[in-house]
Amino acid sequence: MSAYIIETLIKILILVAVFSALGGFATYIERKVLAYFQRRLGPCYVGPFGLLQVAADGIKLFTKEDIIPQGANKFIFTLAPIIAMVSAFVSMAPIPFFPNFTLFGYEIKPLISDINIGFLFFLAVGSAGIYAPILAGLASNNKYSLIGSARATIQLLSFEVVSTLTILAPLMVVGSLSLVEINHYQSGGFLDWLVFKQPLAFVLFLIASYAELNRTPFDLLEHEAEIVAGYCTEYSGLKWGMFFLAEYAHLFAFSFVISIVFFGGFNAWGFIPGGIAILIKAGFFVFLSMWVRATYPHVRPDQLMDMCWKIMLPLALLNIVLTGIIILI
């Protein structure tokens, strides 16, 4: 077995382990953040400052009975959370999380694969996760799950169009689909960040990413007041945990991608080293998603579609046209 294959396998294992652990810890952070905004304490009983709440929740999920409803399609019911997990982690393959570094005289590239269509690969594989809520809702033999599945189809497909069109303008400026090349394009300093050259693209992509991540205010797929838990209604135990671990993995992936594409990625930020800089940027966008959840109410499905097709899509197309004109001039 070649050294490249061994190195890639080790990277995959580290990536899955690290982001699985971060996904579990993010549940604690989010509960603490929401509690702060709502003037509560949040988790505080299990361990110091409630830090062991993550371990307690993990043990609970692993030991809960795995229930499959009568009349459900067992194979598809089991396959859906696996698709969610696989799409979340595979989409991370082209993301350069840190700058290259040397370990024991061997240069390490902290990404799985530097493919020349990395950004497109990230969006395409990540969007394959849409099949998870669709299949989960169809296989559950439950009307609330079915409604959540229908909402997933409408919402995720609609915003996939917007997010794809939105990234075209920044890619026209950079001239490459590689996330590594996009990062290097902004290496000149603070003013080279694409957020200053493409502010509209940043805002549109951020909103579209919240819709694709099923984050508030776009969490129509599992709106508790309307459809119980949506496509997850019949899930319990480990399968239920896999859905939400995939959701947090997607959140971390989008946070890193937004940091790389619009905010200089892992380039040094003044006196702050690049590796620490990208962690600060990605951490801010994870926190921002929690802040938005605590601040904004849910939107109705018709409001969501109106915003997508009547506002965001025309703005994305207008941004492409204006960017093309500026490049030609």
UniProtKB/Swiss-Prot annotation:
| One example GO MF annotation | oxidoreductase activity, acting on NAD(P)H, quinone or similar compound as acceptor
Among InterPro entries, the record links this protein to: NADH_UbQ_OxRdtase_su1/FPO, NADH_UbQ_OxRdtase_su1_CS
Residue ranges annotated as coiled coil are: none
A Pfam family this chain is assigned to: NADHdh
PROSITE patterns according to UniProt? COMPLEX1_ND1_1 (PS00667)
Supply the alphabetized keyword list.
Answer: Cell inner membrane, Cell membrane, Membrane, NAD, Quinone, Translocase, Transmembrane, Transmembrane helix, Ubiquinone
Its annotated compartments are: Cell inner membrane
* Membrane-spanning parts: 9-29, 42-62, 75-95, 117-137, 154-174, 188-208, 238-258, 269-291, 309-329
What biological process terms from GO does the record include?
aerobic respiration
What sort of enzyme, by top EC class, is this?
Answer: translocase
Q: Please give an example of a GO cellular component term from this record.
A: plasma membrane
How would you summarize the oligomeric state and partners of this protein? NDH-1 is composed of 14 different subunits. Subunits NuoA, H, J, K, L, M, N constitute the membrane sector of the complex.
This protein is called NADH-quinone oxidoreductase subunit H
